[in-house]
Amino acid sequence: MQVTFLGTSSGVPTRARNVSAVALRLPQRSEMWLFDCGEGTQHQFLRSELRLSQLRRVFVTHMHGDHVFGLPGLLASLGLAGNSNEGVDLYGPDPLESYLNGVLRTSSTRIGYPLKVHRVHDCAENGTLVYEDDDLMVRCTPLTHRVPAYAYRVDQKPLAGRFDIAKAKDLQIPPGPIYAQLKRGDTVTLEDGRVIDGTTLCGPERPGVSVVYCTDTVFCEAAVDLAQGADLLIHESTFAHQESEMAYQKQHSTSTMAAQTAAEANVGQLVLTHLSPRYAPGNAVTPEDLLKEAQAIFPNTCLAKDFLTLEVKPRCNSL
């Protein structure tokens, strides 16, 4: 998995940071998922190496404009980018469908591919999966914000153990398509009549990776529970610690709240995003100050910036 930040500012864009959007690339299936879609996100795609035509799913955390104003335009442009017949599935709060229908209808915009909206409220409340396929699972949980908001967790299912080619050659198993079957752990009958159990040629299962996207929220235990043991936690950090009172009033997180969540959840790495424009470089408090505050609590923290790309690895610990 690869994570690319397309927008890392809160509320409004700045010269250096667009508003919220994070792309999750799944290279093994030539597919991409998007988390939030603030105004200007499709322009960010044009400035990146991402291919909009690979977009398959969009997960929306909440209905504030800096997280959704870019969605109608992006979906309209997607039809011109050669989107596949599979279409796009969207997941989010209850008002997401009526919002999109209203904008598309009043602007006389026609979407020429399948588009389906899934409400996540019941999944969040009941602890059921938002999405699952052969390789991945997605869960969500309610956050504490001024409007209904949800954090999402993507878990890759365990990977098959590594195939021992040397052992296969020692057994005089001829190379070819049969190796693919054995790699999957299938039992195969060879032309000479021998029956080979593929699991005997594979090492132990390897853990998949996990990513949690958590915004907008003040510190809450639900976020800690969702993020338990995750390899990568992307967490909003709207305010510096000295603005804690304002953070509680507006139900946003400080840098120290994000770090506290990461520490209590025992994640591999924390990335701070959704920074208030007030912390621009050269101001009294800068993004680097927020980073230092978080690192004092959770050392393996980095600061997101637009177009930063991370390769997600088990217990993610490096850029």
Curated annotation (Swiss-Prot):
Similarity annotation: Belongs to the RNase Z family.
Binding site for Zn(2+) 2: D66, H67, D216, H274
Subunit details: Homodimer.
Gene: rnz
Assigned EC number: 3.1.26.11
Protein name per Swiss-Prot or TrEMBL: Ribonuclease Z
Binding site for Zn(2+) 1: H62, H64, H145, D216
Active site positions, chain numbering: D66
Lineage: Bacteria, Bacillati, Cyanobacteriota, Cyanophyceae, Synechococcales
Substrates-to-products reaction catalysed: Endonucleolytic cleavage of RNA, removing extra 3' nucleotides from tRNA precursor, generating 3' termini of tRNAs. A 3'-hydroxy group is left at the tRNA terminus and a 5'-phosphoryl group is left at the trailer molecule
InterPro entries: Metallo-B-lactamas (IPR001279), RibonucZ/Hydroxyglut_hydro (IPR036866), RNase_Z/BN (IPR013471)
PANTHER family hit by this protein: ZINC PHOSPHODIESTERASE ELAC PROTEIN 1 (PTHR46018:SF2)
